[in-house]
Regions:
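Class I S-adenosyl-L-methionine-dependent methyltransferase catalytic core
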Residues: 1-179
Length: 179
């Protein structure tokens, strides 16, 4: 079963792309919600991430499969040293870009100090907690990581529901001003 990135989440993720970015990769494109939000960029969406030639991108935006049983195109005998599939793809992408925006399971950071330290050493700029209802039928809490190579300040924690409430309030305030 694939879990399609909801369009609102895809838009939120793409809003985090650095302004000077041109060449963007979505290494694990599924139904295309993230891809649809990337118009105006030179987008690379390989049909098989595992067969891709090494390259460098201005930014990578992705929602990788969290488990190898949901990943397509894995080479026979592929060994990823016991890492969960999504985390493996994330670490490979860290070699290909200075900016990564990734929808990941919360346990990527909550059940391993080693993974958290590794992400922070790259530059874990922000983590946005997503609502449990983000993916219907999924039992995994998810979040969006914003990685920026060299970022060494405190990681910013956000709650997606609060971002939406603030945005709606701002729109209401603007409407009130126009009356």
């Amino acid at each position: 079963m694939q879990f399609q990135t909801p369009i609102e989440i895809a838009k939120y993720m793409c809003s985090m792309i650095p302004h000077n970015s041109i060449k963007i990769m979505e290494p694990t494109a599924g139904s295309g919600n993230i891809l649809n939000c990337l118009s105006g960029y030179q987008v690379i969406a390989p049909s098989n991430f595992f067969d891709m030639e090494p390259d460098f991108f201005d930014c990578i935006v992705m929602n990788p499969p969290f488990s190898s049983k949901f990943a397509f195109g894995i080479p026979e005998g592929f060994e990823h040293k016991g890492m969960r599939m999504g985390y493996y793809i994330l670490t490979e992408c860290m070699k290909m870009s200075d900016h990564i925006i990734a929808l990941m399971p919360w346990f990527t950071i909550s059940d391993s100090d080693v993974r958290l330290r590794y992400l922070k050493s790259f530059g874990l700029k922000s983590i946005t907690a997503l609502p449990r209802k983000t993916f219907q039928y999924a039992r995994i809490q998810t979040c969006v990581f914003e990685l920026d190579r060299g970022y060494c300040n405190e990681t910013i924690f956000r709650v997606y529901d609060e971002i939406i409430k603030k945005k709606e309030q701002n729109e209401t305030d603007k409407d009130s001003e126009m009356d």
